[in-house]
Amino acid sequence: MGVVSISMPDELEERIDTFADEHGYTGRSEVVREAVRNLMGEFEDKRLEDRELMAVVTVLFDYETTTVEEKMMHLRHDHESIVASNFHSHVGDRYCMELFVLEGQLEDISAFVGKVRATKDTLSVDYSVLPVDDINMFT
């Protein structure tokens, strides 16, 4: 097995160590390996391929980190073919939330979510995906 060196904030390293201890992992490498496998597998759901999808992506970031908001604006414009709607809101005194409603194919939605997740200084990125042809099951 190869060895990969990664950089991360001390606080995240401590959280990983605590998580490993509390959940019976042998160490942080095992936690990171599982997290990477899960992340990579998220968009490998064959049931979503070749279908029209809608997605909601929620991004939380610190109000003081103005570069995140600017990057979200650029992503919205760069992916305007799939961004159906975008909403910005203040959460408490310190945070901002950016919400995107997307419509498109899995590959395009995956690329968008990946770029949002790769944006430095985001605190949380959450999303859900639903095939548009399944909407009728709710009526």
Curated annotation (Swiss-Prot):
Note on how the cofactor is bound: Binds 1 nickel ion per subunit.
PANTHER family: NICKEL-RESPONSIVE REGULATOR (PTHR34719), NICKEL-RESPONSIVE REGULATOR-RELATED (PTHR34719:SF3)
Organism name: Haloarcula marismortui (strain ATCC 43049 / DSM 3752 / JCM 8966 / VKM B-1809) (Halobacterium marismortui)
Full protein name: Putative nickel-responsive regulator
UniProt similarity note: Belongs to the transcriptional regulatory CopG/NikR family.
Cofactor(s) needed by this chain: Ni(2+)
Keywords, sorted A to Z: DNA-binding, Metal-binding, Nickel, Transcription, Transcription regulation
CDD domains: RHH_NikR_HicB-like (cd22231)
First and last residue of the signal peptide: none
Single annotated GO MF: nickel cation binding
Domain of life the protein comes from: Archaea
InterPro entries attached to this UniProt entry: Acetolactate_synth/TF_NikR_C, ACT-like_dom_sf, Arc_rbn_hlx_hlx, CopG, CopG/NikR_regulator, Ni_resp_reg_NikR, Ribbon_hlx_hlx, TF_NikR_Ni-bd_C
Annotated Pfam families: NikR_C, RHH_1
Positions with a binding annotation for Ni(2+): H77, H88, H90, C96
Role summary: Transcriptional regulator.
GO biological process terms, semicolon-separated: response to nickel cation
